[in-house]
């Protein structure tokens, strides 16, 4: 099955089915002309709609605002799913054009910044949503921004809403609630992923990814104290701050205990 939005065949068949990993598919590739200088009161925009399948999870991320909902119904059908097969709808942030079709999915729970909703009841979501899906808060474009980091056989795919609009920018987000916070979220998404699915474009390969050198690789001249278990950023000093958990030092994110080096506390 082709899970890459640019029609490049990804070879999942080379891996044993005994330990399947999550799969990601762009159902509807989004677009926007909001960053065009020619746009004067006639903005055209559609969010990217993504399918995530992980064992018992069938999730649609940002069901969007389509002129015709049949577009989404047909896209799901091509992957072998009915609307009622979807059991979770994820909303990456609070801008309405990303979630107006949420009512299509009557049997699904809704996952968003404040929790996982079942009807009128809400429960906190866990950062490690499943073995292969991690959820982190990524504000800046909007205070309620969250991103999914999905482990697949092709690497980690970040589904990040409008943290990035598309591969080509814009660097300055005219709608961002906080440019400085957005910059931090962009660094986080870039460092934690091999692929990015932006809010209004197709999947693209991450330009930069910090990772642990493979065993036997030549050692860097700079000393390394260790690395973060989440984003694999390398630390030169044990008091370095992690870009994905900047309130913790290396010891905290490594051992997940109260830190005696910097006196910070692990989030419980």
Task: Please give the residue ranges for each predicted region.
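Zn-dependent metallo-beta-lactamase
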Residues: 1-56, 190-192, 207-221
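Core dinuclear metal-dependent hydrolase active-site scaffold
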Residues: 19, 26-30, 42-44, 49-53, ...
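Active-site HxH/HxHxD metal-binding segment of metal-dependent hydrolases
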Residues: 40-41, 45-46, 63-131
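Active-site neighborhood of phospho(di)ester-bond hydrolases with catalytic His/Asp-centered motifs
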Residues: 61-63, 85-95, 101, 111-114, ...
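Metallo-beta-lactamase
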Residues: 143-227
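Short Cys/His-rich metal-coordination motifs, predominantly Zn2+-binding knuckles/fingers
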Residues: 153, 231-234, 245-247
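Cys/His-enriched microdomains
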Residues: 226, 240-250, 257
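Cys/His-rich microdomains that often coordinate metals
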Residues: 235, 248-259, 266
């Amino acid at each position: 099955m082709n899970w890459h939005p640019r029609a490049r065949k990804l070879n999942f068949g080379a891996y044993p089915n005994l330990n399947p990993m999550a799969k990601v598919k762009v159902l509807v590739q989004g677009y926007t002309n909001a960053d065009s200088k020619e746009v004067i009161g006639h903005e055209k925009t559609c969010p990217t709609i993504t399918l995530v399948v992980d064992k018992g999870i069938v999730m649609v991320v940002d069901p969007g605002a389509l002129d015709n909902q049949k577009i989404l119904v047909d896209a799901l059908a091509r992957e072998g799913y009915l609307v009622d097969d979807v059991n979770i709808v994820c909303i990456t942030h609070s801008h309405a054009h990303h979630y107006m079709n949420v009512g299509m999915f009557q049997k699904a729970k809704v996952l968003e910044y404040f929790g996982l909703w079942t009807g009128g009841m809400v429960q906190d979501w866990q950062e490690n949503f499943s073995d292969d899906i991690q959820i982190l808060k990524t504000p800046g474009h909007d205070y309620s921004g969250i991103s999914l980091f999905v482990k697949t056989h092709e690497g980690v795919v970040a589904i990040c809403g409008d943290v990035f609009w598309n591969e080509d920018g814009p660097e300055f987000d005219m709608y961002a609630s906080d440019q400085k916070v957005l910059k931090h979220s962009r660094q986080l998404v870039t460092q934690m992923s091999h692929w990015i699915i932006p809010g209004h474009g197709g999947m693209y390969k991450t330009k930069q990814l910090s990772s642990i050198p493979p065993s036997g690789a030549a050692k860097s001249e700079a000393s390394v104290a260790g690395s973060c278990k989440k984003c694999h950023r390398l630390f030169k000093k044990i008091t370095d701050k992690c870009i994905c958990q900047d309130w913790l030092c290396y010891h905290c994110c490594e051992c997940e205990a109260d830190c005696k080096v910097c006196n910070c506390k692990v989030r419980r």
